[in-house]
Structure formats: structure tokens, C-alpha cells
């Protein structure tokens, strides 16, 4: 490394801050010209997914971008190599520089039996691990063209194929229902995906959603916001050409400040007469007649099924709180909330690891990664040195496997088993749930309707009409591919190597692990087998013998859930912790199934034993009241020690 002084660091920091200020001036000009996202457009609803604490997101993005621009200044000034910029600059701290105020603040961690709401202080040595508004973890170094933040290029130095072209040529839109899993499985996959990750995207300092595709911007490239990384649409695109579209909106993720504060690469109510989530008229909602529902995640309104599963969890939380209150009448409302939440979190972990993951990953992968919960007793496997944060490749690629499982339409069934209605998954319009009886009818539909098969066939609703506006929408597959490039994800071949699989030497070898037609399409799209993106190849892989996923995605997903299990101080099976359940309580938690949650929180009278799998001889439909679908006994929570 060259000799970089504190003066050099200050100069780079000042330059980084100046660049951010110039971007803010551009944002003001764009607003003045009316070049902002139009309310009600597909771009508007895409942005609405990421609306959390807008001010906090903007501040984090500004601080992270300042550090990135300062790093780029150092790279340019000292002509650093990619290795020097990625590894050498990590030894230079922002502390005591002019941009020290962009460093994340560390807070003390109190001793408690309850999780924090933002995930902080789960790990007492590293309070930021797994925290909301924090960086994703990485298991492979990022692949940026400049070593810092410029999107990956092909191995010959040219651009990668358009993400839309990859989606259009390699992914079909055919109806291929699963022979095994239900819509409930696909719904749980999306529920988990949203619970585990939300990637913040860049917003303007004034709160505007940034516009990337517009005729005026195309004619005057100076007006293109630096955070824009639009997806190019080819002239011969069979769907978008009839609308004259040549550009698909895409904003880069915010640049999160590095937790170690060093220079370096980019890191990335009542409704229908039933208890339901409270409504909030201020939320972005497509329906003019019925407001959207408020939950901890604005994406819960993305479609009626997501709102449905959030509603089930609300009901279960309140059911637990009522029962705990009757057992412990002296508990305050705050203690009831915390204890019910603690128990609900344990239930969700148990359902995920005993019912969902075995279907997704198969028994061999479950065993290899030690994912299966114990049948009795405590676990003492907690690892304080394991970062349980969400892995970048999981959040931006493998965790999005569920998009291939989505049905175009959702079925509804009466209590007599008659299919009486069908609804399209509308953008941010869960108004269906305001109708009496719709909640139970949708639950029955999730249990009876098969999900789509996991493969390179994707619902037309997602591939061409995502957040449909004026006849056309966006393409979720193209956006997923673009997000992987935005985050510097290495190509598919590097992930195979990471997972212990043989590296592919040519496209012919690709044909042996996926559908031949898809492999040949990849060979026409990419110049080198090492160029192939992780997401489309991971989706196209042949599944493992007893699993839904193929080997590469199974590896990434399994590693993520291994970390979430072993690196979680509050894991429900842990013994010897302030948060530990008693052994009697733990045995009751082990009775929980998704079918039981549906039984306890709806008017559905009969459900198959395993809600994620279609009814079969080994998976019969049982009456919710006859005891075959086990029920927790909360008697062992009487006089439970609490923390105030």
C-alpha cells in the first residue's frame, strides 16, 4: 500500500461529502422539472415496498455514500488495484477524519430475556450483528468492476446481457402446478423472506422516489440520478415493445456505512366482522374504497395472501396474550406483549425448521448443516462468534426462490369445500379481506391449491405485470438479477465452488445440471460460463432428490438458516440463557404446527396435518377439534418469571 496520510483521508472525505451535496442539488432540480415517480405507477408501488423509516434510510444512504465516494477518491488518487481497494483500505479508519460523524453509533446492551425490536444486542460482543438498518454479511468477496461499487462486467470486460433479456429468453410463463406443495408453502416462503430481509433503496433527500426512466432523462443523461441502474429493454422484446418501453426502472440499494467505520468496498381492526390488522389510510394502497392494513412491514399489503398470514400471526399473538393473562392476572400489558411475542417467535422458529425447511432442503442437507431441532431437552450449541446476520447472497438471490412458486390467481373455498371464487393477486390491494368470510375462504384456498413448481417457469403476473400500470408492469426476475449485480454478487460458478460443487468449465457441462433448453439459452446470452448470474442459474438447477431447491441455492439457504439457528442467543431450544424456556414449556412448543395455528385462529374446521403439503393418504384432513392436530398446553407458563 502507498503511504496514505491523515491529510489524504481528510481530503478524500471532503470530496465524498461534496459529491453527495452535488447529488442533492440534482435531486432538487429533478423535482423542479417534475421528474419524480408518479403516484399509482408501477414504479411507485415498487418503491412503496421499501418505504420504512424514510428519514433514517436517507441518512444511512447519505452516510454510506459519503464513505464510498471518499474511497473512490483514494483509489483514483493513489491508483490502487482492486485488491488494494478491497483489502488495504480496510486498515484506514474514518474515525478522526472530517467524516467521522458518518460512523455508526454503538449502544450499550442491557441484560434481558426478550429480543429487541430491531434485532440489536442479540450478540453481546457484536451488538450490531443481525440488527435492522445494518449491512448484510458476506461469505464471498463482492465482484465489482472497479473493486468498490461499479456493477460486475463480463470476463472479457464487456457488459453483461440485459437482465430483462436473460429473464425473457431463459424464463417462460407456463402454468406448472406443483405435485406436492400447497400455496401455503409458497406463502410461508414469502412471509419468511420478508421477515428476514428488506433491502433499502436510494431515495432523494426531500423524500421523493427517484425516477430513472423518462424521455427527458434519456435525451439529457445529466439528469440521470447516480443511484439509477435501469434495466435495458431490447427493441424486439415480445411484451414491452408494444408499449414502446426501452427502459425498466431500477434504483440501487443504499450504501450502508461500514460497521467497523473503515474505508473500503460497498456493503450492502376489524374487517368482515373478524379480528384483523388495524387499517391505515396513509399507506400506499391501490384500492380507493378500502384502506390497507398496518403491520410491522408495509409489504404485508403487497397482496391479499401476505396480509392474510400477517393477520393469522396477529390473532395468534393476541390469543396467546389472552391465555397468558388468565394464567397470570398480575402481569402488565407490556409483560403480556413481550411474553406473547417471545412465545410466538418460538412457534415461528419451530414451524420453519420442522415443517418448512425439510421440504425445501431435503433430509440430507438438513442433516449436513445440523438444522433439525431436537426431539427433547435443550440445545447448548449457541456460537457467540457466529454472525447471524442475513447473508447478501441469500437476501438478493437464494431467498427469492419463492417467486417461481407464485400462482397467477388465488383460489377461495367455502366451508362445504366448494370453490366459489378466484382472485388475481392485486398490487397493494388487500381489499378482498374486508369482505365477510373472505379470510377463511382464502385460508382454505392456500391449503387446497397447489403452488407452482420450482423451476424456470414464472407467473406472468410477476414476469410482465408486476405492479401493473397502464397495461404493463415490471419484471420481478429481471429486477432480481439486477439486484444481484447491484450488490456485487459473484457469478454462479463461484457459488458452486463455495458450496463444494465442481466448477463448470463450459456451457455443455451446464446442460447436465439443468434443463437443456435453459442451459443453451444461457450459452447464447452469456459470453463465458463464468459470467452467468447466480439468481437465474440457481432457479434453473435440477432439484435435489428429496428437496425443492437445487444444490447451490440449497447450500446458500442452509448456511443462512444454520447461522440463524446457531448464532441466535434467543433460539427457542437454547438452555442456560436468560431467555430459556423450561423443559416442560419446550415440549409444548414442539407440538406446534402451522395447521394448529390455522385451526386456532380461523373458522376453518378441518385441515390436513401438514399444511404445506397437499392432502394425501399419509397427510389426511383432520377435524381441528378431535385432537389429532396437537394443541399446546400453556399451563406451564403459570407464574412464569418475568423481566421488567
Regions found by a protein language model. Name each.
Residues 1-304, 315, 322-644:
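Terminal regions of secretory-pathway proteins
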